[in-house]
Amino acid sequence: KDIVGLVDGYRESAQSWRELLLDLKRRGLETGPELAVGDGALGFWKALREVYGETREQRCWVHKTANVLNQTPKSLQAKAKGHLQDIWMAETKADAEAAFDYFIEAYGVKYHKAVERLIKDRERLLAFYDIPAEHWKHIRTTNPIESTFATVRLRTVKTKGCLSRKTALAMVFKLILSARRKWRKLDGSNQLAELSHGFKTLVTRRLRYGFQCSYGY
């Protein structure tokens, strides 16, 4: 697991993400990763389809859960969250599909907006099930890099004065390098070579102040 790209860009624009992905391609990642994991940022997915059109998409379940629960009353959110967890914590894809259908049936009539937000990404939410189970917990959310971004946000918020573009980029890069020392080893890492052409995953998120970052394994 390692950082593979960091650029400054304009919010979630497709152009900013395109620059990062093209930089990865220029530096040797000519064939795109098998799977890309991220939230619902339209800019990233648009750029990914243009640069690495064969890469499969996996939506982050943490972000999607929050997005769906926002369309339900607070009194129901704990119960609905449990039913959503039944989907992405299922032991098989068949069980996940069954739990998905149950959520639609249970909430579709009264909370159709919540269900609509879920079903529009159905295939992209369940893509991780086509990968060996040892890797699931690393690729169904963006959690593996969220703690790193929290470190970056904490430091940038406390930084006083106006940073130049180069200074800000250098500071963010050093913070990520420092946080990388605490990254835990991937479960099932010894099986990566057995996957088709050395399975690669790209996990992306936008950092504070418009920095785009990706890491892969």
For every predicted segment, state its role:
Residues D86-Y217:
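Acidic/histidine-rich catalytic cores and adjacent linkers
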Residues Y52-N70:
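Inter-helix linker motif
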Residues W45-K46, N70, A127:
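Short helix/loop capping segments that flank catalytic or ligand/cofactor-binding pockets
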Residues A66-E91:
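Conserved phosphate-handling catalytic cores of large alpha/beta enzymes
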Residues G9-S13, A36, E57-C60, T72-L76, ...:
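A generic short alpha-helical patch detector that favors 3-5-residue windows
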Residues K1-G38, L42, K46-A47, V51-E54, ...:
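RNase H-like nuclease fold core
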